[in-house]
């Protein structure tokens, strides 16, 4: 739900507690302290923490996102939204992304505009990412910083050198003495640490002697991070979806106590699925469901309404479990 609505979260760590903060804009995110972080290569000895590796990439995006949905209450009047790319300079308008959103995807136009805006911001957030490696100890996801002394960004405006940290992976090893003969236990992180542990220049022999004597390790700290421009809206990628359509199911028609037939003004009915163990007898525990009829049209057609306790077959439009449709009735042991 958060991904669909454009919400994301970060964690604030303090000495006595950890707090999860939800937000929908990068403007509320705090900066690192200090805010400016220098870039320098690994072969340079520095007294201050800095970023040692940096890479960036981008993808070609569509120039606009076009959505369409239909609602049977407004027959013949499809609902549409057209959302232009926020990064219009690098997204040709001719490259349109068209998506059909199924039955009654939104009720009001501003709701459809917001949902489509969130999706196009998801694409743009993922399209331009930076990756790096550093020894900066205060690196933390949900914070932003300003890059300095990088040759590709030195002449750019301040906002083009400000980056939001999306993910930070930290590796740290102490310099405590280790046993000469040690065995890796199941689930050990030793293999992962070997893949990232730096080899200090000129100290290879010293480290080998230290390992042999068991007097200690040189220890290290580094992190890998992913980020984006702070000026670009961040949206979590769509990675969590509704459960898949389970296929056609049967259910029992339910009505309030004392009613053999019960519908709304559109002749829709309520049902109780066989797996529903919470709904009570006589309770309308489902939404109103439309039912397929032998014929239907303006001023002609026929309608048959199932009675309480009768069994019906239900399918789901566009594989959406929130869009059930009654296909017809079936006989069972209680109704020969």
Feature-to-residue mapping (PLM):
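Amphipathic alpha-helical and helix-coil boundary elements used as assembly
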Residues: 2-336
């Amino acid at each position: 739900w958060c991904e669909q609505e454009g919400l994301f979260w970060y964690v604030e760590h303090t000495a006595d507690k950890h707090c999860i903060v939800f937000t929908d804009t990068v403007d509320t995110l705090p900066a690192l302290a200090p805010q400016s972080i220098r870039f320098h290569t690994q072969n340079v000895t520095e007294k201050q923490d800095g970023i040692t590796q940096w890479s960036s990439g981008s993808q070609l995006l569509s120039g606009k996102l076009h959505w369409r949905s239909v609602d049977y209450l407004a027959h013949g009047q499809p609902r549409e939204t057209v959302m232009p790319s926020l990064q219009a300079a690098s997204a040709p308008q001719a490259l349109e992304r068209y998506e059909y959103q199924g039955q009654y995807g939104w009720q009001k136009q501003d709701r459809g505009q917001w949902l489509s805006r969130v999706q196009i911001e998801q694409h743009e957030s993922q399209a331009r990412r930076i990756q790096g490696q550093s020894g900066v100890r205060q690196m933390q996801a949900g914070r932003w910083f300003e890059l300095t002394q990088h040759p590709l960004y030195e002449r750019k405006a301040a906002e083009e050198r400000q980056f939001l940290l999306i993910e930070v992976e930290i590796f740290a090893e102490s310099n405590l003495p280790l046993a000469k003969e040690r065995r890796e236990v199941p689930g050990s992180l030793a293999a992962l640490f070997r893949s990232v542990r730096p080899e200090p220049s000129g100290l290879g022999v010293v480290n080998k002697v230290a390992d042999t004597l068991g007097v200690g390790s040189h220890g290290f700290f580094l992190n890998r991070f992913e980020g984006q421009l702070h000026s670009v809206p961040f949206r979590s990628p769509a990675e969590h979806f509704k459960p898949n359509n389970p296929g056609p199911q049967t259910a029992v028609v339910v009505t309030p106590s004392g009613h053999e037939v019960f519908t709304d003004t559109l002749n829709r009915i309520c049902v109780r699925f066989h797996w529903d163990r919470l709904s009570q007898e006589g309770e309308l525990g489902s939404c109103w469901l439309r039912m397929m009829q032998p014929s239907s049209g303006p001023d002609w057609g026929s309608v048959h309404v199932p009675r309480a306790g009768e069994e019906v077959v239900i399918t789901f439009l566009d594989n959406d479990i929130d869009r059930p449709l009654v296909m017809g009735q079936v006989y069972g042991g209680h109704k020969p």
